[in-house]
Amino acid sequence: MTIESLAPTDALPWHLRDNWAPVLDERTDTELRVDGVIPPELVGTYVRTGPNPASGTSGHWFFGDGMLHGVRLANGRAEWYRNRFIQTPNISDPLDDPMAGMGDLTRGTGNTHVMAHNKQLLCLEEGHWPWRVDTELNTLGVQDYGGELTCSMTAHPKVCPVTGELIAFSYLSPEPPFLHYIRISPDGQLVQLEGIELPNMVMMHDFNVTQNHIVFMDLPVCFDLGALETGLPFKFDRDAGARLGVMPRNGANADVRWFEIDPCYVFHPVNAHESGNSIVLHVSRQKEAFGSSNDDYAEVGRLWKWTIDLDAGTVTEEQVDDRPGDFGRVDDRLVGLDARYGYLMAMAGEGNSEEPVYGSAFWKYDLASGACVEHRLGDGVRGAEPVFAPASTDAGEDEGWIISIVHDTNSDQSRLVIIDAQD
């Protein structure tokens, strides 16, 4: 389904045409066709979110209303598919200018990431509070942790597999200290909201967590009102420098140690872990971001390894591979621990400033050796973020499946793929 428009398709911005075009109808389909075999032990609901303007138009990719797509798997069957708008005030009372709602924390879209914590499904983006939905994709309301959360929350919190804590942060603040650290208990209570001093506001899309530390990425996509005319008030400024901030997980601003690195940008790290008195990070690093405008995605990330030596006060920066990839994940049971395998989506379209181009493969990296195994999706098939589902609660690492919704540009159809992670 695509938006109908009187304008020629090629006259629309890239995020409103082809597979990016808004889906305006909500639907529920049952007893879905299955090609191949769904493992009978794979039981649960796959849910993804993405920007999907309910009005049919938006000024920037990032501003579209959140739409959820879910597929329920059980007993070797795909029982249902459904898509639902996240019912935020932006649906019932839309604003002409999305930036006008930045001060109202209820006006989130939930269009960037979905995750579970404390038996709740959270839909997130980085400028507002999360929104809660149930397993049928019905909207339940905002999550402000009993009124204790007084700032926005990142789209990419981490759930510690050891303690069950939700670790998060917030960067969208017009006033110092420009960054806040957020820690939520396993039962959903806000236990820490800590101001972290930065020299200015930067677009900190994601961060890193280990068993004992937080690693913030102060990278030079800086607040710049002059850039607002291209969609967002942020601009890459190499002269601002780049650094990593290491803090104990229960620490405060005074405990942060900063380590300078070469200027770059990272939308998504893959994982981080401790090794002796060092912290090892694997990230999808790109040379810069938003080159000609805030709608320029010509730069793509590649897998890099950063090793922070806490004794020497240094960072070693190493490129692991030259293949472009992003949206990296590990087994959620190993977030912040020494995971061996990372799963990334290939990126295409390097140098194409007109639109982002998702690749036609998934990469599985051995993070210890840097070796990479490719899974081809097929010519003209575009991937999405790969999610690992273990075969059982006690299955070993890499014993399970990679799940994602991919799009076939040849047939203009999307499908859920389930791939044996070891095949």
Predicted regions and their residues:
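Beta-propeller domains
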Residues: 1-423
